[in-house]
UniProtKB/Swiss-Prot annotation:
This is Homoserine O-acetyltransferase. One of its GO terms (cellular component) is cytoplasm. It holds the Pfam family HTS. Its EC number is 2.3.1.31.
């Protein structure tokens, strides 16, 4: 089934070329189906790239999904135009009276900053508090996962001696959990971060469960026992070339960056990267939409 997005969203053309089933708003209005209402709080600097990555995954399920975008009004974006934000995005003040079936909170390249030094931290706390009553299930990604774990459960982030950068094998900790239904015993996920989360604090919390982790990359997926809060520390949504672009960007800046692990064949950065996380990324988002959103949300969101 399709994703429903604004007719003139730039990501629409890219997704259509990839044969992702995109339905324009004008056509969707003629169908007598209630789509799942998903709101994406996009904290990434280059918002159009993240839009395309997430819409690609949301559009690969049997469910019709209507996507809205949010941004933080207390932060001035340097990499996304004001016109784009005004055309396609809303603030918490504009959506706070609405309810959504699901929400995605993206990462942001600010994990080394203390939370109270993030210029939109107070607004983000307001959004996360609002989500507890206005969203059926929220999926947090990378820094969004760290921020969510800290806000909701007091789990601290911890600095890493060097950047966790590469594609790593992961295992399933909790057999038969719905979020990982259909996953192989071992699967790969990209990571790109300077901080980790305190595993001991997660294990000590009665409302949290570590669903998946990696010997090299640490905790990967944490979920609340009721499924309303999902925290994913990696970047399953990344394109094949995203880590390569980050590596080349940091090298151009003169940073001491290592070649992403398990990414280029024989760690040779001149060769085409290996894409080996696509199937599991589609499955992760499909399972979340099906088991944690669609099967849990009321038909009438006003209830």
């Amino acid at each position: 089934m399709p994703i429903k997005i604004p007719d003139n969203l730039p990501a629409k053309e890219i997704l259509t070329k990839e044969n992702i089933f995109v339905m324009a708003e004008s056509r969707a209005y003629s169908q007598d189906i209630r789509p799942l209402k998903i709101v994406i709080l996009n904290l990434m600097p280059i918002k159009q790239t993240t839009e395309t990555q997430l819409l690609r995954l949301l559009g690969n399920t049997p469910l019709q999904v209507e996507v809205s975008f949010m941004y933080t009004d207390t932060h001035i974006s340097k990499n996304t135009s004001y016109d784009h934000l005004q055309t396609f995005y809303q603030t918490i003040d504009e959506v706070k009276q609405k309810k959504f079936d699901g929400m995605i909170i993206t990462g942001a390249p600010i994990e080394t900053l203390p939370y109270d030094e993030v210029d939109y931290w107070n607004e983000l706390k307001q959004i996360m508090e609002w989500s507890k009553t206005n969203v059926t299930s929220t999926l947090h990604i990378c820094w969004g996962a760290q921020a969510g774990l800290f806000y909701h459960y007091g789990v601290e982030k911890v600095p890493l001696p060097e950047k966790q950068f590469g594609v790593y094998p992961h295992k399933i900790n909790v057999p038969n959990v719905k979020l990982l239904r259909g996953f192989d015993d071992e699967f790969y996920v990209p990571h790109s971060r300077h901080t980790d989360i305190n595993k001991a604090q997660i294990e000590a919390h009665p409302d949290l469960e570590i669903l998946s982790e990696s010997e090299q990359a640490g905790v990967y997926i944490v979920a609340s026992k009721d499924g309303k809060q999902i925290f994913v520390t990696g970047h399953s949504e990344y394109d094949a070339c995203t880590l390569q672009q980050e590596y080349e960007r940091d090298r151009a800046r003169g940073l001491n960056i290592q070649v992403p692990e398990n990414y280029f064949p024989n760690d040779d950065a001149t060769r085409k990267p290996l894409l080996r996380w696509r199937a599991h990324s589609y499955l992760l988002f499909s399972n979340w939409l099906n088991y944690y959103v669609y099967q849990e949300t009321p038909y009438d969101l006003s209830r």
